[in-house]
A protein has these predicted regions:
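Karyopherin-beta/Importin-beta family HEAT-repeat alpha-solenoid scaffold
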Residues: 1-956
């Protein structure tokens, strides 16, 4: 907001409009105006005035929120000599407004906490606050609020206070932690039966536990710990207080993850949590789900904390396996939300046990995992009155998917085959309800792929078995059947045979899940090809029924992927399905999956048949595109070609026949015939980014399919790309250009044409990025531009390095290093790394000296700027996950010329700010020299990365 300060009356009107204007557009205008006000320098004074006047809750909340935001993001706007008066003003406001609204108190508490963290001159802020307000009972609630949010804000990403200041703060808070605990004890004594005060005490204590500054020996014998468990054991405790106490215990458990250094507190927490089993059962009996969930959270955190002990010393001391019993008790609760809380622990347990690879240890945990799996199978049961197929996108469907993932991760402890056989035996014994059958089949489907069809497993198999309660008889002769059993695993074969013979009268959900199971058992089908016909017949029945069609299509896709050679004889059948694809009620993903499976089988046909078959497979989609091109746009008729483009793309992507050198690619003729249709489609929809993206994707896989066999398309394709891109800057053209460079960049006759393409594409690209916030608004363009440039460096480095466009591209790469976008930043860093690496790579090749010279010229011109920018972006712009990529670029620069890099890095370090605007030390001279030495003496890239991680923390 530029210009003069707005009047308070105008601000009040905007706040009123934001909360009370019945017109949504009025609310939107008010929100925008107030947002501009918050970003202006006038916000400080206006917020202070609004808080003084206290006209209404809405204006006070806006002012408190604004004050917090300004302190977090714009503290540098204030002169240092105004900080003390701001502090005093905020403390006055929170005292005056303490009874108006809890959310206002929280916002002001955050503002005070953030101010304290950024104000080095406010020494011992905890002691100051406690001395000032602890004797006034009415001030205790907001005092506790400040002391709660203060530790929480220490690691806030909104505050870039740096590691040095953060360390200073943590040491200060640790020093005064006993003062805070004493205050909390006083509050408990004064609280009596005041539940709200107790909740604030527990929240505050949990916050200090989370920061890790409480003395564990002191806390082990503290009355607050005993009070926590007393509250959790009492049946009469309210839900809100119970949740606050539970959160606090979880925070305490999290804080002692390093058990050995916190042994006294660890023992107290361990014993305390074990006493909560009775309280859990009482909560179950009272059907108090909130408390049940709280107990499960505590039990899970207990197991997470003592995981190392549980795995290394199971059944001994803190490795007591009663912890697992508590989780299995929770797994027995009828609500699936309860067991779901513990999933992360079970994942971690499985990971630890997998790494130990100790059969004796594994044997100890096997029974626990078996019990867990049986509980999970029960939780996966649908309601008996459920109709239709299982939902996969609702909460319960997502829970089942998480169960499936967990089972896959834990199955190694039981043994896939043993578990599969156990589950199967539960279905053979008796006549279980349909929902039990479906859930067991679901778990079997989760582990089917991990079952080795070659591994023998002894289990009694009766030829006339009762499968799932239905009598089945094999059409295979006894002799043939016994032969199969001798060669393969009997359980797998019997399951497969039983599933494909399920009567159509069973519940739709059972059929649906059995189809999924068949799809997961594709390796068994591959080893038992005599089952292929009945399996395909079974899946075709499902394909013809709307509820089952997509699952059946996915299963057929799986069969095609694994049984490609056996499926070749069924290609004509697949072709018929593909021709009538839209007659089946398939999801778009399932339809594409079917075509993928068909293409995989097509690639296994004899080369002389592939051309004709591919043409047949593509013809339906091509005819549909032609029809769309010929019709005039009209209301009610879709002219969207993306469905057919996606289908062609998947066909091209997965038709990968083995073609010997000198042979004409069998797909070449078909793609050349289809090109005019794709070209016309692209031209018609040139302004529609979504459709153009699908066109480019289709062309990308067409080019990849035939490789250099697409040479005839190169000239017309590049011409059309450049022409359209000059009018409509769809970044997918840059990506498609990178594919062309990858395929043809090493062909001498194509290099100049590809360079011309790059230069032509760069002109509108640079114009786009030069716009205001161009990099931030067009990250996809940045991503694809540097993919294209990287391909050039990889395939024809000298061509690019000699060109006039290399310096502008590098300048844009340097500018783009600040872009906080994962994919775009990764592409930029990869380009920089590969560009510089060109100067040292493949020194045996004849163009090495030329490459080395050209890279030297580029680095002499822009090397210092690049190093300075990389250091700046690491410290101030990019998240930590980008540091390995930056380290690789710095490492490559060092490999080219280490002495020069040392100078560049030294100059860059001199340009960094050494203090914050309020005088706090950001980085010391020793820290600068240590970092310089660590980087320049590094013998591996990972050492550069480690040094960067530590150094950049000083500025975060």
């Amino acid at each position: 907001m530029e210009g003069a300060k707005p009047t308070l009356q105008l601000v009040y009107q905007a706040v009123q409009a934001l909360y009370h204007d019945p017109d949504p557009s009025g609310k939107e205008r008010a929100s925008f105006w107030l947002g501009e006000l918050q970003r202006s320098v006038h916000a400080w004074e206006i917020s202070d005035q609004l808080l003084q006047i206290r006209q209404d809750v809405e204006s006070c909340y806006f002012a408190a929120q604004t004050m917090k935001m300004k302190i977090q993001t714009s503290f540098y706007e204030l002169p240092t000599d105004s900080h003390a008066s701001l502090r005093d003003s905020l403390l006055t406001h929170i005292q005056n407004l303490k009874d108006l609204s809890p959310v206002i108190v929280t916002q002001l508490a955050l503002a005070i906490a953030d101010l304290a963290l950024q104000m080095p001159s406010w020494k011992g802020c905890v002691q100051t606050l406690v001395e000032k307000y602890s004797n006034d009972v009415t001030s205790l609630p907001f005092l506790l609020e400040i002391l709660t949010v203060l530790p929480e804000e220490v690691h806030s990403r909104s505050l870039r206070i740096g590691a040095n200041r953060r360390t200073e703060i943590i040491e200060d808070l640790a020093f005064y932690s006993s003062t805070v605990v004493s205050l909390l004890m006083t509050c408990v004594e004064k609280a009596g039966t005041d539940e709200k005060m107790l909740m604030k005490v527990f929240r505050c204590l949990g916050s200090w536990f989370n920061l890790g500054v409480l003395d564990s020996n002191f806390m082990a014998n503290n009355k607050l710990l005993a009070l926590l468990f007393e509250v959790l054991q009492q049946d009469k405790t309210s839900s809100n207080l119970h949740e606050a106490a539970s959160d606090c215990v979880c925070s305490a458990l999290y804080a002692i993850e390093n058990v050995e250094t916190n042994l006294p507190l660890a023992m107290q927490l361990f014993q305390g949590v074990l006493t909560l089993e009775t309280a859990y059962h009482m909560a179950v009996a009272r059907e108090d789900l909130d408390k049940v969930l709280n107990y499960c959270r505590i039990f899970t955190e207990l197991c997470e904390t003592f995981l190392e002990k549980i795995v290394c010393t199971p059944g001994q001391g803190l490795g007591d396996l009663r912890t697992l019993e508590l989780l299995l008790i929770c797994a027995g609760h009828p609500q699936y939300e309860v067991v779901e809380i513990s999933f992360n622990f079970w994942y971690r347990l499985g990971e630890h046990l997998y790494k130990t690879n100790d059969e004796v240890i594994h044997g100890i945990f096997k029974a626990y995992i078996q019990r867990l799996l049986h509980a999970l199978a029960r939780h996966c049961q649908l309601e008996p009155d459920h109709e239709g197929v299982p939902e996969e996108t609702d909460d319960f469907g997502e829970f089942r998917m998480r169960v499936s993932d967990l089972v896959k991760d834990l199955i190694f402890l039981i043994g896939s085959m043993e578990c599969f056989a156990q589950l199967y035996s539960t279905l053979k014994e008796g006549n279980p309800p349909w929902e039990v059958t479906e859930a067991v089949l679901f778990i079997m489907a989760a582990i089917a792929k991990s079952v080795d069809p070659k591994k023998p497993f002894s289990i009694a198999v009766c030829h006339h078995s009762l499968l799932f309660g239905w009598n089945i008889t094999s059409e295979i002769s006894n002799c043939e059947y016994l032969s199969v059993l001798r060669e393969n695993n009997p359980t797998l074969v019997e399951v497969l045979e039983g599933v494909v013979r399920l009567p159509e009268t069973v519940h739709t959900a059972v059929r649906y899940t059995s189809i999924e199971l068949v799809g997961e058992m594709s390796e068994v089908v591959d080893r038992n090809p005599q089952f292929l016909d009945p399996v395909l017949g079974y899946l075709m029945k499902g394909l013809c029924e709307k509820p089952l069609a997509s699952a059946a299509a996915k299963a057929i896709h799986n069969i095609c992927s694994v049984c490609r050679d056996h499926m070749a004889q069924h290609f004509n059948g697949l072709l018929e399905i593909a021709r009538s694809l839209d007659s089946f009620m398939l999801s778009p993903e399932a339809a594409v999956g079917l075509l993928k499976g068909t293409a995989l089988v097509l690639a296994r046909l004899p080369l002389d048949k592939i051309t004709e078959c591919l043409s047949e497979l593509c013809s339906v989609q091509v005819m549909a595109l032609k029809k769309l091109l010929s019709q005039e746009p009209s209301n009610g008729i879709s002219s969207d070609p993306t469905v057919f483009l996606d289908r062609l793309a998947v066909i091209f992507r997965h038709t990968n026949p083995i073609v010997e050198n000198g042979q004409t690619h069998p797909c070449q003729k078909v793609i050349q015939e289809i090109w005019p249709v794709l070209s016309e489609t692209l031209n018609k929809h040139r302004a529609d980014n979504r459709i153009v993206e699908r066109c480019c994707r289709c062309l990308r896989f067409a080019v990849r399919c035939v490789g250099k066999g697409s040479a005839a398309l190169l000239q017309p394709l590049v011409t059309q790309m450049v022409n359209v891109y000059h009018v409509h800057q769809h970044s997918c053209f840059l990506y498609l250009g990178s594919i062309l460079v990858d395929e043809y960049g090493m062909e001498e006759g194509c290099r100049q044409g590809l360079l011309d393409m790059l230069q032509a594409l760069c002109i509108p690209t640079f114009q786009l990025l030069e716009q205001q916030n161009g990099l931030q608004n067009h990250p996809d363009t940045v991503d694809d531009l540097f993919r294209l440039a990287t391909r050039f460096i990889q395939r024809s480095p000298v061509t690019l390095l000699r060109s006039q466009v290399v310096i502008p591209i590098l300048q844009w790469a340097i500018a783009s290093t600040t872009l906080d976008h994962r994919d775009a930043n990764c592409s930029v860093m990869r380009f920089l790394r590969d560009l510089i690496h060109t100067g040292v790579a493949n020194d045996h090749e004849e163009d090495f000296e030329l490459r080395k010279e050209l890279i030297g010229q580029v680095m002499n011109q822009l090397g210092q700027q690049l190093v300075s920018q990389l250091l700046h972006t690491c410290c101030f712009c990019l998240p930590p996950y980008t540091l390995p990529d930056v380290a690789e670029v710095l490492w490559e620069i060092m490999q080219v010329d280490r002495p020069t890099f040392c100078r560049w890095l030294e100059n860059s370090l001199k340009g960094l700010p050494k203090e914050t605007t309020v005088g706090a030390v950001t980085v010391t001279h020793k820290q600068l020299t240590d970092f310089h030495k660590q980087v320049t003496s590094a013998e591996e890239c990972k050492q550069v990365c480690w040094a960067l991680r530590d150094f950049t923390r000083l500025f975060r």
